Amino acid sequence: MTMQLGLALVLGVAMCLGCGQPLLRAPERPFCVLWNVPSARCKARFGVHLPLEALGITANHGQRFHGQNITIFYKSQLGLYPYFGPRGTAHNGGIPQAVSLDHHLARAAYQIHRSLRPGFTGLAVLDWEEWCPLWAGNWGRRQAYQAASCAWAQRVYPNLDPQEQLCKARAGFEEAARALMEDTLRLGRMLRPHGLWGFYHYPACGNGWHGTASNYTGHCHAAALARNTQLYWLWAASSALFPSIYLPPGLPPAYHQAFVRYRLEEAFRVALVGHPHPLPVLAYARLTHRNSGRFLSQDELVQTIGVSAALGASGVVLWGDLSFSSSEEECWHLRGYLVGTLGPYVINVTRAAMACSHQRCHGHGRCAWQDPGQLKVFLHLHPGGSPGAWESFSCRCYWGWAGPTCQEPRPELGPEEAT
């Protein structure tokens, strides 16, 4: 599938930021694609310009990895996140119970003030992947956190029998983990209230690929769904959701759409928890495949970015590491992919989402598939730039609007109530 887009389309791409309104809450932006790749060195060190703005991709100033449009906080960059290193070394006590919540929040507040301007309106993504805040979610290598919690309970409650110590270990871990995650989000939202705060990879889905094609459906695992229901407090404390739609290595192309669809549908399900209006859902997607380093093909962009737009997501965040700007050759390689494949598709999808919004939703909502089970029609412009037929799409109204086509003003559903 080839997108034939003229210069007029490139020049006509609207920016995600405008009029000082928070990112993604400006009513004219039904779908955004954001750049979370540390590519500043391409221009600064090698003189290779990446025309992200012209291609409809929102990036930080100077294409820095951290900035006012998007900032991701890794485990050592916000507060005192406890975890075990690869060799078992405990950092910040290793487990949530060992961390002083007051000290954690004080350090996090200092880092937020230092990293984000007071008027920050972008995405604030917390990447804490070492443990799950629910005891049952810590299996495999994460069982180290259960073992350390049991040892903690034995020290703190030496007179209890082993079963009671296990109960104390579980309760202590879950209570401390919840406090760390919930209060960190609350702190961020208090200090930078116009930003969109949430944790990367949440909600989880458990529909990864394990090499068995005969019974793969793409549905989320029942245990993952149950854990997400238990994490009601996390969704209530968030102001955006950032699920991952990284295509698993070896996943056959026939299953790409189901894999992405069910991950996003689970995010839409929990996005309503604790909020009068659904939280924005922005899926994290990779530029390349994890094992091979091969860039996503046109069809794979359709099954990630295209499916996200057609399901009604607020946007997609494109992630990459320093390898993309490690040399002049890599920078030219990245530029070629941007200009030849990724950029034209992003322009097409974002303009199609805009056209559908205005045609079906009075410009006050985003289009989403009426029946996600019939994923035949995408938000694509035809070659030459003409809009498609949007009969397969219904409207998801922005804050402050309601009705089948988002034509009814509802001031009581304004952003201040919804966040």
Swiss-Prot record:
InterPro entries: Aldolase_TIM, Glycoside_hydrolase_SF, Hyaluronidase, Hyaluronidase-3
Glycosylated residues in this chain: 69, 215
Domain EGF-like: 352-407
Taxonomic lineage of the native organism: Eukaryota, Metazoa, Chordata, Craniata, Vertebrata
One annotated Gene Ontology cellular component of this protein: acrosomal membrane
Lineage: superkingdom: Eukaryota
UniProt subcellular location: Secreted; Cell membrane; Cytoplasmic vesicle, Secretory vesicle, Acrosome; Endoplasmic reticulum
Keyword terms, alphabetized: Cell membrane, Cytoplasmic vesicle, Disulfide bond, EGF-like domain, Endoplasmic reticulum, Endosome, Fertilization, Glycoprotein, Glycosidase, Hydrolase, Membrane, Secreted, Signal
GO molecular function: hyalurononglucosaminidase activity
Disulfide bond positions: 42-331, 205-220, 356-367, 361-395, 397-406
Entry keyword annotation includes Magnesium: no
Active site location: 129
Gene coding for it: HYAL3
Identification of the protein by name: Hyaluronidase-3
